[in-house]
């Protein structure tokens, strides 16, 4: 697992993290053991390294670096999950995570059957949800609108532009770079 060793003041480098090997913990009631399969690396993670108040608490020195993740349940002491379930949550930069399914930054959810697991970290994850709610609830494009998307080359911006077109925008202009 990778734990935060020091807080960066500029660019993030490997020196800010420490590779630590630990035994897989025994589960307590209500916990599941997840083998992490996929991690999402997002710009917001840089902000989580700063020791400032934000929409989520900062990653503390000595804590596993947080990340949106998809994994497979390998053991369960929670009746809502069984071995083999594919789940999404915030399991962090580690191979195995013992987590309580009802606590944490992101509640643990099963990835619906038929959805590629990696899509839970993109179009059906924070990226897609940010674009969806930003466009549908805030931007509210209507038939014939011209919509400008800043950051259109990024994950969220590219989805936002597509949603604008689906909602009827005549023109979608993207800023990239």
State what each model feature region is:
Residues 157-158:
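N-terminal Rossmann-fold NAD(P) dinucleotide-binding loop
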Residues 131, 161, 165-166:
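Gly/Ala-rich phosphate-binding loop of Rossmann-like dinucleotide-binding domains
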Residues 1, 146-147, 172:
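Conserved hydrophobic helix-helix packing surfaces used for dimerization/oligomerization
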Residues 165-177:
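Adenosine-nucleotide cofactor-binding segment
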Residues 12-23:
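Short glycine/threonine/proline-enriched tight-turn/helix- or strand-capping micro-motif at secondary-structure
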Residues 65-72, 79, 83-151:
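NAD(P)H dinucleotide-binding glycine-rich loop of Rossmann-like/cofactor-binding domains
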């Amino acid at each position: 697992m990778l734990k935060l060793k020091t807080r960066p003041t500029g660019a993030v480098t490997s020196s800010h993290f420490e590779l630590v090997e630990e035994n897989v913990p025994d589960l307590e009631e209500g916990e599941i053991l997840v083998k992490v399969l996929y991690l999402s690396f997002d710009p917001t993670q840089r902000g989580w390294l700063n020791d400032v108040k934000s929409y989520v608490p900062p990653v503390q020195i000595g804590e596993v670096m947080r990340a949106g993740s998809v994994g497979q349940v390998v053991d369960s002491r929670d009746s809502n999950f069984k071995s083999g379930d594919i789940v999404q949550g915030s399991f962090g930069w580690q191979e195995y995570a013992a987590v309580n399914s009802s606590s944490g930054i992101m509640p643990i959810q099963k990835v619906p059957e038929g959805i590629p697991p990696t899509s839970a970290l993109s179009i059906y994850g924070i990226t897609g949800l940010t674009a969806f709610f930003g466009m549908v609830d805030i931007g509210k494009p209507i038939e014939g609108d011209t919509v400008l998307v800043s950051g259109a080359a990024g994950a969220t911006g590219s989805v936002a532009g597509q949603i604008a077109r689906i909602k009827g925008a005549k023109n979608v202009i993207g800023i990239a770079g």
